């Protein structure tokens, strides 16, 4: 018996975009980022950042469902994220005024600020009672993808500079000081710290995703695209 698979036009386009994305990522992943074209690097970083944001949103949603509705959690005031001091554009006027290299610098500062916290989020996801296996896996994937994004961002940034930066020592990123609360033996302090971490990583990865799309529009498409997030 012959089976015929019929795809709607919309489904066929989604499949085409998915396959194209995978092929592009395989093409880039098979090369050192230093020899990947700027256009391809932007396309792949946007794909990576968008997927990472989806995972961050899923992790935050799961935490919210499992933990955040506890009565004591509702009475607490959420503190500022540790990246709040990093200057990033907040409206279209600031976006247009910011130079590409300064834009990349800001995004790198946000991304590198999450290297250490994401390591600890992975540990907490594995050891927290009530956290699913899926939540732990997504935390690991977020940590790994952030490093991939960071490597690509550094490559793009270096292409705007006369002097190549080999590491992040010259970037002005804020230190994270939330480990004490995260390691607290008090369950309320511990869970509240995880809640804040999940909330902030979702917020910041959304920023990275949005800003990469803005820069891709500027650099790759010469501003001939619609980015209306601001």
From Swiss-Prot:
GO cellular component: extracellular region
Keywords: Disulfide bond, Glycoprotein, Hormone, Secreted, Signal
Gene3D superfamilies (UniProt xref): 1.20.1250.10
Compartment annotation: Secreted
Disulfide bonds: 81-200, 217-225
The keyword Disulfide bond appears for this protein: yes
InterPro entries (UniProt xref): 4_helix_cytokine-like_core (IPR009079), Somatotropin/Prolactin (IPR001400), Somatotropin_CS (IPR018116)
Positions glycosylated per UniProt: 109, 158
GO terms, molecular function: hormone activity
Chain ranges passing through the membrane: none
Disulfide bond recorded as keyword: yes
Pfam families: Hormone_1 (PF00103)
Signal peptide from the UniProt entry: 1-29
Family, per entry: Belongs to the somatotropin/prolactin family.
Protein name from the UniProt record: Prolactin-3D1
């Amino acid at each position: 018996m012959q089976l015929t698979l019929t795809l709607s036009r919309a489904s066929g386009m989604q499949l085409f975009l998915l396959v194209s994305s995978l092929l592009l990522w395989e093409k880039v992943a098979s090369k050192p980022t230093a020899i990947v074209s700027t256009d391809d690097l932007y396309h792949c970083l946007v794909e990576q950042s968008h997927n990472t944001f989806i995972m961050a949103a899923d992790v935050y949603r799961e935490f919210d469902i499992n933990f955040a509705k506890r009565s004591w959690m509702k009475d607490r005031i959420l503190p500022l994220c540790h990246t709040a001091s990093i200057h990033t554009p907040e409206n279209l006027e600031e976006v247009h005024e910011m130079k590409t290299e300064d834009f990349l610098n800001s995004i790198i500062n946000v991304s590198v600020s999450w290297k250490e916290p994401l390591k600890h989020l992975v540990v907490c996801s594995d050891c927290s009672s009530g956290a699913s296996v899926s939540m732990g896996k997504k935390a690991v994937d977020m940590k790994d993808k952030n490093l991939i994004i960071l490597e690509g961002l550094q490559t793009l940034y270096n292409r705007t500079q006369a002097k190549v930066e080999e590491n992040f020592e010259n970037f002005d990123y804020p230190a994270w000081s939330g480990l004490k609360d995260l390691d607290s033996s008090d369950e309320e302090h511990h869970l509240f710290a995880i809640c804040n971490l999940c909330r902030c990583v979702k917020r910041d990865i959304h920023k990275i995703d949005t800003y990469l799309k803005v820069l891709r529009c500027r650099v790759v498409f010469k501003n001939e695209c619609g980015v209306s997030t601001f």
